[in-house]
């Protein structure tokens, strides 16, 4: 089983490569292991935004800010 860090790295690489659906799956897997990491929610939001799923992306960005209101990375 992969760790949240491994899944996050895989997802970031997939984002860079334009594999947005795969990246989304990686970030969702990471979130299932740690639901309180604002960076994971932000990354999931980026993947969703890249897929044109804007409402869901906003929900993820809001969740990231809910966990850490000082998180400047929340898009």
Feature names for model-found ranges:
Residues 4-5, 38-39, 72-73:
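Helix-start (N-cap) detector for alpha-helical repeat units in TPR-like alpha-solenoids
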Residues 16-17, 50:
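Register position in tetratricopeptide repeats
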Residues 29-32, 63-66:
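Conserved structural position within tetratricopeptide repeats
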